[in-house]
């Protein structure tokens, strides 16, 4: 069992989410970690606004490294490094996780968490992989996250200007798409890809509307093909023109 607590390196963002200051929250987090440890529950410490804050603007990667170290110092079991609003760019993701692994090289302690708001989270995933990160958080269909408001089982715009205008911006990178990406890079992962794609399609049927995965529609890169879609007559035409079956260029 595990629970999660989150801090933002930019204090205005942190205050908007928690209602308290960073120093006060750290005290509460340490108290909660001790309580959890007493009953065998692990604590995952989240660091947010690593690559920028939607409220305070630019942030320093070095601050996020310090926050990561402090989480571990007060007893967190592992760290979720979160891009909660899709601010990250691939070069900065690589730079950050290189800094993290130089400081704390145990990859089992680190989890990458990328929200999809600009259709570039797959590039961030690749950059984190290249830096050496092994663990990623994803959700089927990209569900979760902002906005937290639902009406008739559908995500709707949150209240206030802080929320995205488009309620489809509701969560993490899609598990289906990320898994296909990793699988086709030849990286071992231990998942049944076809089963995950099936689950993604079933989830869309369950919620009753289109989610964000492209892989559940377009599938994996074909290796066998679909000859039932072939235009009839190619073999006869090649024979008529005096071409061999596998000839690609004129002689």
Model-based region annotation:
Residues 1-251:
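Catalytic cores and adjacent flexible loops of soluble metabolic enzymes
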